[in-house]
Regions:
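Active-site neighborhoods and metal-handling regions in enzymes and metal-associated proteins
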Residues: 1-200
């Protein structure tokens, strides 16, 4: 017997520049960047997955920001393994953003624990004392936020394994698959989920 629940939300630009805002009920989706979020719970255990999507071709600057956030995500994931301090992961991603001139667009930590609660220890945050241990489940979600453009955030639920990590959420993360044309965006997202589920 499985007890499952699902919550999805979408933050259209410019609200996507506010990481935990509540969009106006009547807000219309622009072309992007739109942050899509899915919180899922199975038998009491939580998982989350977030992606930045576009309902039209991104502006010339948006792909650069998208790629930078994905680079920070790859950096953070490369550090995930038992014995690593969570603060060192956050420090590394923040340093990457600062080195590229985007330090003032960091609004929150790189990640957090996830399990019985949606946000719990360990905190992947500068100055924290948490150390990753095997079988911890965390989110990895480095992000950048721009008042004039919107937010760029990708979150995955990640299991810490004995020698690294395993992604527990599987959803396309490349820009090509996250540009969906306005008239078919729901069908495109549904199709991507089904294709991923078939290969699960």
């Amino acid at each position: 017997y499985l007890n499952c629940s699902f919550l999805t939300a979408a933050w259209p630009a410019p609200k996507s520049a506010q990481p935990h805002s509540v969009p106006d009920f009547h807000a219309r989706m622009g072309s992007g960047p739109i942050v899509l979020m899915s919180y899922n719970r199975v038998n009491g255990y939580a998982a989350e997955c977030e992606r930045t999507v576009f309902l039209d071709e991104p502006s010339p600057r948006e792909p650069e920001l998208f790629v930078l956030v994905m680079e920070a995500r790859s950096l953070a994931l490369s550090m995930v393994r038992p014995g690593v301090s969570c603060s060192s992961i956050d420090e590394a991603t923040q340093e990457l953003f600062r080195a590229r001139g985007y330090g003032e667009h960091i609004l929150h930590r790189t990640g957090h624990g996830i399990g019985l609660g949606n946000h719990e220890q360990p905190w992947i945050s500068c100055g924290g004392s948490d150390i990753l241990q095997e079988n911890m489940v965390i989110s990895v979600e480095p992000a950048l936020y721009f008042d004039d453009i919107g937010g760029f955030r990708h979150s995955d639920t990640v299991l810490v394994t004995n020698n690294g990590y395993e992604l527990l959420t599987r959803y396309p993360d490349d820009l090509e698959h996250l540009i969906v044309k306005r008239q078919n965006w729901i069908a495109a997202i549904k199709g991507a989920l089904i294709r991923k589920a078939i290969h699960f």
